């Protein structure tokens, strides 16, 4: 069941309202994310403390994502997003009050990171599953491309804004900015976003959480293209960890990098992502989603390989920008593939598993490649992972199940389950 309006102006308005609310949330969250990271880094100068902060920021979301996917299918997704925003803002307010009272213990920062991770874990499947309720299927790629451009633009501005604010005011004042932006986002959703709950949310929920979770994994297992895609997606996320996290260290070692060099590589990467999102919004990708995923994945692999061999800093920055351009071209069709082909009543659970993969595989990659980078040159890591990404992306074209799924434009239903309503549709 599609819940978006048939009126062109109506769906555009509702989508604009939703994306605007998400931009407010993302901006405030990004300010706090950078502020907490830099505060811990400058106060402790400890790699262990930074690692604990990173773990507290991703582990709760990883653990919660599958259950959050169940909630996104059982309940009103708009309300889930609103409640998680309110919860994050409340936790941020508590920390701000502690700081104002003179308590500056590091464990408070870790607790806040964990609470924010819980909120993110709850709302991410709901956000990804709500968008197809607002946007006509044929417009999903372009809208996701626009969304990536907006997010990239904010991620370009956020570290600069956070650094400027941290130099002019206290951490607790910056936390209040996040609370205000969260309040604005919630107000926009409550007052201006009008979207009906999806079909399953309107039904009486007779099954338990774990039964629904089991049905979600059963759905993934029954539809081979989802299983194949998640295996590919997870391996790619693991392999691109070096190009995502080790570039500052590589620039410092190879090009005797300064703060200026590190700023340049951050800027060119996010400018590339901004451009890539715009390209996807205009182009829309190939007719087959998997072909676009394979092409962009191959370009990411070539760019990563080039980071290991390019002799000059500006050449390095150029290939990093190329990777940035390719990220939205990879992520957008990946997201749309799920949004187009998965049954609406299972979309939250499928996105929950996808969120679990995205929140786990890159940190796992860093846990492996980080120590390795202290033993061998990062250039070799980039070369090897780049080659593997190219080969894996090329191999996707040979997967008939995935290629066939890339052509589909209608959701596939789950095989009839006696415990689950709304799944009488014939399986494709």
Regions of interest found by a model, annotated:
Residues 37-43, 96-101, 157-177, 253-254, ...:
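Transmembrane alpha-helix termini and helix-breaking/packing motifs in multi-pass membrane transporters
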Residues 44, 76, 98-100, 310-311:
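Helix-breaking motifs and short loop linkers at transmembrane-helix boundaries and internal kinks
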Residues 16-33, 56-70, 76-91, 108-166, ...:
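Substrate-agnostic recognition of the 12-TM MFS/MFS-like secondary transporter fold
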Residues 129, 133, 175-206, 397-411:
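Helix-loop junctions on the cytosolic side of multi-pass membrane transporters
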Residues 4-60, 218-269:
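Helix-loop boundary and gating motifs at the non-cytosolic
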